[in-house]
């Protein structure tokens, strides 16, 4: 899984989930690399998230959800981290997180990213039903305001409603998080869709740029 973005000066960023087949030692990790010559060549990949599968680790790693844009010439990456094993299993009913990374955040990689959303601010809603490779939080999509002052991340959160006779599955809600300090904090957070009528809100997308 990968995502592309373009900076103000034309630089191209590529953020991607680790290829667990060819690099099993970096299972569930997230990488970023950048090109300043229109994609002809890219710099050395930088690990921006290091999944911890050790005895005391949380075993949260990226599965599919990753999105990026640029805030000026600063990359801005949103990604999901889901409870999983290095043998290929994941747990849609367990707590997950939405994270944000930029090279303008304090600290050093791969420990620079911050948590945007988890069970502490959106509640715990396990995903049940058909295997859509979804979890209790997932599929983030990121955008930036036209003046470059604000970042927005929209993502999916399972609701407390289920439906379907043959394969009962959780309905999903769409949540939106906002930041005005370059992604260091995300104090603006709320559900976008109405409570009624009950519908399955999925796969949200945020415009990378917005002139209004």
List the predicted regions and their residue ranges.
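Extracellular, repeat-based ectodomains that mediate carbohydrate processing or recognition
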Residues: 1-212
């Amino acid at each position: 899984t990968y995502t592309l973005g373009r900076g103000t000066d034309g630089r191209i960023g590529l953020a991607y989930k680790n290829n667990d087949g060819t690099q099993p030692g970096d299972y569930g990790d997230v990488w970023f690399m950048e090109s300043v010559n229109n994609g002809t060549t890219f710099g050395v990949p930088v690990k921006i998230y290091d999944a911890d599968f050790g005895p005391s680790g949380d075993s949260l790693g990226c599965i599919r959800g990753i999105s990026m844009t640029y805030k000026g010439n600063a990359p801005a990456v949103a990604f999901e981290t889901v409870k999983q094993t290095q043998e290929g299993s994941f747990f849609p009913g367990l707590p997950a997180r939405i994270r944000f990374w930029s090279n303008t955040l304090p600290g050093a990689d791969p420990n620079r990213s911050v948590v945007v959303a988890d069970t502490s601010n959106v509640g715990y809603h396990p995903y049940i039903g058909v295997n859509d490779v979804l979890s209790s939080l997932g599929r983030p999509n990121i955008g930036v305001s036209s003046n470059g002052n604000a970042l927005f991340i929209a993502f999916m959160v399972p609701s407390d409603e289920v439906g379907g006779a043959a394969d009962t599955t959780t309905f999903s809600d769409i949540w939106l998080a906002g930041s005005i300090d370059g992604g260091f904090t995300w104090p603006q957070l709320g559900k976008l869709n109405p409570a009624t009528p009950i519908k399955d809100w999925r796969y949200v997308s945020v415009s990378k740029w917005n002139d209004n």
